[in-house]
């Protein structure tokens, strides 16, 4: 429009004739609207902005809707110039529909309201509420949910999003809020959205993620739809949550009785149920006279055949290939290695404690011996997730705690820890608390770890006080390896409890600073909080060099970064950069950090780094690197890791410390023949399982000084800590369905319904998923998470 025409419109607005004035206002509206529709017509806006004082004078003389109409027009004109007037006139007018001005104007308007909220603009915030509500309406109606959510978070009104969620935008909104939840606590709003939309699986998982286990159980009990309830029961069972149910089917699912049947059916369907040959693990083993390798071979064999109920050594079936091992001769020698051997039988029969009881009955009810202790450990490991059998198994284990030998008591405690980790079972407290006053320091320290693991995340005051007292009284033994179990137990109590302070620094004593750093790592597990990482590194690397403190600092940073891709990469670079300090303890801790960051998730650059670590020549570094290769490759059958480990045999076949861990690492790579993982993250990698996290971290933590670690020197059976970290990585369904698998695409903030997977392949269930792969299906299943066991919703 020509400048002259604009001039006439401005003049006519001042005309006393009402009709002329109305026409001029309508023309001004049309000009302003057309300028907005062209993004911004600078010529029109510039002229109108220069004559804004004239329009403002006219506005003062007008009344009623005409005045409000002109206020809105003036507000729209101010979009290129005066933000305060833009907001003030819109608040005064607020009569013209926002869609007339378009998205750019609304975006500018919400920016002004946010500035008012943050005291960057002098204007009463209360007066902006109606305008803000209209802006939110506009944004949600025009598929700009993400800008609306950003605005609501900025002004502290995120609860309003509940009014706008529907089936059309639900997935986009939830995905965006879940991603934003890493920076702002939006969990309560997200849970309310799940509840509103009737998304049972996400709601239950959300409660579990918030450590609201009781609410999750009560909600599942209240679900009336049979199929959805059944699906949520599988979720509870997977997260080790149990309640007494009268329905036999509910009881069967909740007690994890289904795992054995489903797991073995999938193994048979994939034709991997027959025993593996294990040539690499048995290489160089002399069956007739070599008993020193029994423990490591038993553990490795247990990991490979975990859950299948058959193997080539102890439990072969008719027609299976067998290892020519004299089983009777093994039973004849009562040596500590038998704890690992019999424990491995329980691992092979995982989720089938009845069979273990039948197989090892004569040893379980015998007098104190390594055979009995190993059999009890095996029984506990077989009942790791079976809630029905726990009371009976605990009763059998409790008798063995009366032994005068610490190795028997510790192995029994390991079985109790594996079964009850994360359950906060009071019967375990009553049973174990007297052992905190045992004459054996090793028993005291391992009891602390067991209690910490059982009550992880509870911040229990009585246990905290008891462990702090032990921490001070046993300070003289802080240099021993078993003292670290006390440190682990105390830290476990504060798992993901940022709201509680331990007070370890106030009591002082040896390793109090070390413990405070470990506790901070546990408090912020998986948050990826860069400020916490910076704080830990500052505390660890300031002052004189302290090998344990620096190692703990890096491990705690890895713990904080678990599950967060960006943070994991950052900490990975920090850890690799620490090698520039040229310290042997940092060279040893590097592979351990990687095994926390990438469990069952081999990365090419990480394997390159670990392969170089094997050439350093320091025993500590070699052992921690070999175990880390096993942890990173656990259950992946990764050919490169297998090749690297095979190559090490020719160097270390005579090394009594390296060879056992080499065999165990080889067993880990073939964990469950590829059906199992040790990743502690469930449900699209959003939810940490405390039991799995503690099982993984405690194994890694106890390898800090690996050449003198109990796991390497005298207590090899402690590698069974990893059993509680094992989880099935298959997807199966109550009926055969098509499942698409592929690499996940980050669709956060994308409009419409973009594809969520790339490199897609379609398979019929069951399907095995690696760490980098996700699944989806078009079938009407009862879960939003395509993992584990799915229930097909019947029409």
From Swiss-Prot:
Alphabetized InterPro entries for the sequence: ARM-like, ARM-type_fold, Proteasome/cyclosome_rpt, RPN1_C, RPN1_N
Pfam families linked to this entry: PC_rep, RPN1_C, RPN1_RPN2_N
One Gene Ontology biological process: proteasome-mediated ubiquitin-dependent protein catabolic process
GO CC entries: nucleus; proteasome regulatory particle, base subcomplex; proteasome storage granule
Keywords noted in UniProt: Cytoplasm, Nucleus, Proteasome, Repeat
Organism in which the protein naturally occurs: Encephalitozoon cuniculi (strain GB-M1) (Microsporidian parasite)
PANTHER family named in the record: 26S PROTEASOME NON-ATPASE REGULATORY SUBUNIT, 26S PROTEASOME NON-ATPASE REGULATORY SUBUNIT 2
Family to which this protein belongs: Belongs to the proteasome subunit S2 family.
Record's protein name: 26S proteasome regulatory subunit RPN1
Role description: Acts as a regulatory subunit of the 26S proteasome which degrades poly-ubiquitinated proteins in the cytoplasm and in the nucleus. It is essential for the regulated turnover of proteins and for the removal of misfolded proteins. The proteasome is a multicatalytic proteinase complex that is characterized by its ability to cleave peptides with Arg, Phe, Tyr, Leu, and Glu adjacent to the leaving group at neutral or slightly basic pH.
Quaternary context: The 26S proteasome consists of a 20S proteasome core and two 19S regulatory subunits. The 20S proteasome core is composed of 28 subunits that are arranged in four stacked rings, resulting in a barrel-shaped structure. The two end rings are each formed by seven alpha subunits, and the two central rings are each formed by seven beta subunits. The catalytic chamber with the active sites is on the inside of the barrel.
PC repeats: 374-410, 411-445, 447-480, 624-658
Main location: cytoplasm
Subcellular location: Cytoplasm; Nucleus
């Amino acid at each position: 429009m020509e400048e002259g025409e604009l001039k006439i419109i401005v003049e006519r607005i001042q005309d006393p004739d009402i009709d002329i004035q109305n026409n001029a206002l309508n023309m001004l509206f049309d000009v302003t609207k057309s300028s907005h529709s062209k993004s911004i017509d600078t010529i029109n806006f510039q002229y109108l902005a220069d004559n804004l004082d004239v329009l403002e004078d006219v506005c003062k003389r007008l009344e009623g809707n005409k005045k409000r109409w002109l206020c809105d027009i003036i507000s729209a004109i101010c979009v290129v110039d005066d933000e305060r007037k833009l907001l003030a006139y819109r608040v005064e007018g607020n009569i013209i529909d926002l869609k007339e001005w378009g998205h750019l104007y609304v975006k500018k308007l919400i920016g002004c309201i946010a500035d008012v909220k943050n005291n960057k603009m002098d204007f009463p915030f209360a007066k902006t509420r109606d305008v803000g509500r209209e802006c939110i309406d506009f944004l949600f109606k025009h598929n700009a949910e993400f800008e609306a959510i950003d605005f609501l978070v900025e002004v502290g009104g995120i609860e309003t999003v509940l009014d706008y969620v529907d089936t059309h935008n639900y997935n986009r909104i939830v995905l965006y809020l879940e991603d934003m939840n890493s920076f702002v606590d939006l969990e309560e709003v997200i849970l309310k959205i799940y509840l509103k939309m009737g998304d049972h699986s996400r709601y239950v998982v959300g409660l579990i993620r918030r450590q609201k286990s009781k609410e999750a159980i009560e909600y599942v009990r209240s679900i009336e739809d049979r199929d959805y309830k059944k699906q949520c029961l599988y979720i509870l069972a997977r997260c080790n949550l149990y309640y007494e149910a009268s329905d036999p089917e509910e009881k069967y699912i909740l007690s994890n009785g289904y795992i054995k049947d489903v797991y073995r059916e999938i193994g048979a369907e994939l034709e991997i149920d027959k025993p593996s040959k294990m040539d690499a693990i048995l290489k160089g083993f002399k069956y007739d006279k070599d008993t020193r390798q029994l423990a490591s071979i038993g553990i490795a064999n247990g990991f490979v055949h975990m859950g299948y109920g058959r193997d080539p050594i102890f439990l072969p079936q008719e027609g299976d290939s067998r290892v020519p091992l004299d089983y009777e001769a093994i039973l004849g020698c009562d040596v500590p290695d038998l704890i690992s051997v019999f424990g491995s039988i329980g691992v092979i029969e995982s989720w089938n404690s009845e069979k273990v009881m039948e197989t090892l009955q004569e040893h379980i009810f015998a007098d104190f011996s390594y055979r009995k202790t190993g059999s009890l450990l095996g029984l506990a490991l077989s009942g790791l997730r079976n809630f029905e059998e726990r009371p009976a198994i605990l009763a059998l284990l409790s008798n063995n705690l009366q032994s005068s030998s610490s190795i028997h008591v510790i192995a029994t405690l390991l079985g109790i820890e594996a079964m009850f980790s994360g359950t906060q079972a009071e019967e375990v407290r009553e049973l174990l608390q007297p052992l905190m006053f045992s004459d054996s320091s090793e028993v005291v320290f391992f009891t602390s770890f067991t209690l910490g693991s059982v009550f992880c995340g509870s911040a229990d005051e009585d246990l905290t006080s008891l462990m702090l007292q032990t921490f001070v009284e046993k300070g003289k033994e802080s240099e021993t390896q078993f003292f670290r179990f006390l440190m682990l137990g105390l830290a476990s109590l504060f798992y993901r409890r940022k709201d509680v302070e331990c007070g370890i620094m106030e009591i002082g004593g040896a390793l109090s600073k070390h413990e405070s750093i470990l506790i901070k790592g546990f408090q912020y597990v998986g948050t990826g909080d860069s400020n916490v990482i910076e704080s830990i590194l500052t505390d660890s690397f300031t002052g004189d060099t302290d090998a344990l403190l620096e190692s703990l600092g890096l491990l705690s940073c890895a713990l904080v970064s678990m599950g967060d891709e960006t943070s994991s990469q950052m900490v990975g670079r920090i850890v690799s950069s620490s090698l520039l300090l040229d310290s042997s303890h940092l060279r040893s801790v590097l592979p351990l950090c990687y095994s926390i960051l990438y469990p069952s998730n081999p990365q090419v650059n990480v394997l390159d780094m670990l392969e170089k670590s094997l050439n350093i020549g320091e025993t500590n570094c070699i052992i921690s690197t070999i175990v880390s290769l096993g942890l990173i490759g656990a259950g992946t059958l990764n050919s490169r890791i297998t090749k690297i480990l095979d190559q090490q045999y020719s160097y270390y076949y005579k090394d009594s410390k390296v060879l056992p861990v080499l065999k165990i690492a080889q067993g880990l790579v073939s964990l469950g023949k590829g059906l199992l993982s040790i990743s502690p993250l469930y449900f699209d990698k959003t939810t940490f399982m405390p039991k799995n996290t503690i099982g993984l971290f405690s194994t890694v933590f106890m390898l800090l000084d690996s050449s003198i670690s109990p796991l390497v020197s005298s207590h090899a059976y402690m590698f069974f800590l990893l059993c509680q970290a094992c989880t099935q990585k298959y997807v199966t369904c109550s009926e055969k369905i098509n499942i698409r698998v592929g690499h996940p695409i980050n669709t956060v903030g994308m409009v419409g319904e973009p594809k969520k997977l790339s490199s897609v392949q379609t398979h019929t269930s069951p399907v095995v998923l690696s760490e980098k792969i996700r699944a989806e299906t078009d079938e009407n299943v009862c879960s939003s998470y395509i993992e584990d066991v799915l229930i097909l919703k019947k029409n």
